[in-house]
Design a protein with these regions (language model features):
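Structural detector for hydrophobic anchor residues on beta-strands
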Residues: 8, 19, 29-31
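A short, exposed loop/beta-hairpin motif centered on an aromatic-Gly-Thr core
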Residues: 27-37
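Short, charged, surface-exposed hinge/linker loops at domain edges
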Residues: 1-8, 37, 41-75
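Proline-centered helix-kink/hinge sites
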Residues: 24-27, 62
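Short stretches within intrinsically disordered, low-complexity N-terminal or propeptide regions
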Residues: 23, 33-34, 48
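Short aromatic-glycine-(Arg/Gly/Cys) micro-motifs in beta-strand/loop hairpins
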Residues: 11-23
Length: 75
């Protein structure tokens, strides 16, 4: 039986030479790539791999809880 789909918040950061991504609701689930497109693909794979590992270890899969919001400031 296939589980329901989940949507996790992914934070993508641009560094001096690459992009990094992490998932706040899945501690340790990270990816890095040379482009935004690459890091988006890699974090998708990392999330799937992370969840597979949790299930294989008999651990619960965390429900997505994190959200994001932009805040306007006068600068």
């Amino acid at each position: 039986m296939r589980s329901k789909g989940m949507q996790y918040l992914v934070v993508i950061e641009r560094g001096p030479t690459s992009y990094g991504a992490y998932v706040p609701d899945l501690p340790g689930c990270i990816a890095a790539g040379e482009s935004r497109e690459e890091v988006e693909t890699l974090i998708q794979e990392a999330i799937e791999f992370h969840i597979e590992g949790l299930r294989a270890d008999g651990q619960p899969v965390p429900e997505p809880k994190s959200t994001s919001q932009f805040v306007h400031v006068d600068a």
